Amino acid sequence: MKALRLRVGIGMFCAVFMCAQVSGQSSSLQKGEKLKSFRWPDGKKAAVSLSFDDARLSQVDNGLALFRKEGVKVTFFVQPSGVEKRLAGWKQAVADGHEVGNHSLTHPCTGNYEFSRHNALENYDLAMMARQLDEANKEIYKQLGVKPRTFAYPCGQKFVGRGTEVRSYVPLVANRFLAGRGYLDESANDPLVCDLAQAMGTGFDDLDFLQMKKIVDDAVQEGRWVIFVGHEIGERGYQTTDTQALEALCEYLKNPATGVWLSTVEEIASYIQKQREDTNPPASKK
């Protein structure tokens, strides 16, 4: 009798183990099929956008010539006050075909940062943040004749208020822009599931080319979209994207063997949105 119970017990264990194994294989298969269900254009394996924040002078003074030489289009997330300092240069950026996105009017961040102590998100409400977005759009249009379709969260921070009064302003961004971009996030974007209103941004200031290349190669393996985020463009240093590393990155991304679609945040976000609409068209109204 004991032997029979033992055999029954072993049999049940084996059955459960096999079911779990099959389930795991099925889950892995579904995951693989899911990854294959999204297609980047022209057989590309991943996508990359180069973006730069704050309308820093070096972006115009050093960046435009570099991008013109490389034949690369990037996204500049600007504040009107920064644009005003190099207005002719920013008009040239638009003429060169670069995207200009909104980076708020006055760059509010947490008051824990000394530079934003008097412009702290903790002291904002949603109405104040809405004005930041709308007024910046108006000023950018006056300056450059373009209406931004994308937004970058200052400091990558997405909340206003304190304690029980904290509110996310992601919905404000979603209602006004095609896409919103974060900063210092831990992953590239999965085009199947990412929330375009808070797409992940990957910092590449202070990195050398090999570090940048690894980020790209990882994205290629997973079919993802990397949105690089930089600030100054020049010699390697704090919050500076090194020009030599940037040139090498552009060359690598343009190489057909790399398998990457290099374009602006707006263009890639538009493609993702269209793919989703084509895959899941809205139900027709009766």
Regions found by a protein language model. Give the residues of each.
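Structural recognition of the beta-strand scaffold that forms the well-ordered cores
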Residues: 47-51, 74-78, 99-102, 147-153, ...
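A short alpha/beta connector and helix-capping loop motif
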Residues: 59-80, 279-282
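Acidic (Asp/Glu)-rich catalytic clusters
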Residues: 64-71, 83-105, 142, 173-174, ...
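C-terminal domain-boundary segment and adjacent tail
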Residues: 29-42, 74, 82-85, 177-193, ...
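Catalytic domains of cell-wall/extracellular-matrix polysaccharide-remodeling enzymes
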Residues: 62, 84-85, 109-213, 245
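Bacterial N-terminal signal peptides
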Residues: 9-21
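Boundary/entry segment of secreted carbohydrate-active catalytic domains
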Residues: 26-60
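N-terminal secretory signal peptides that target proteins for export/translocation
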Residues: 1-6
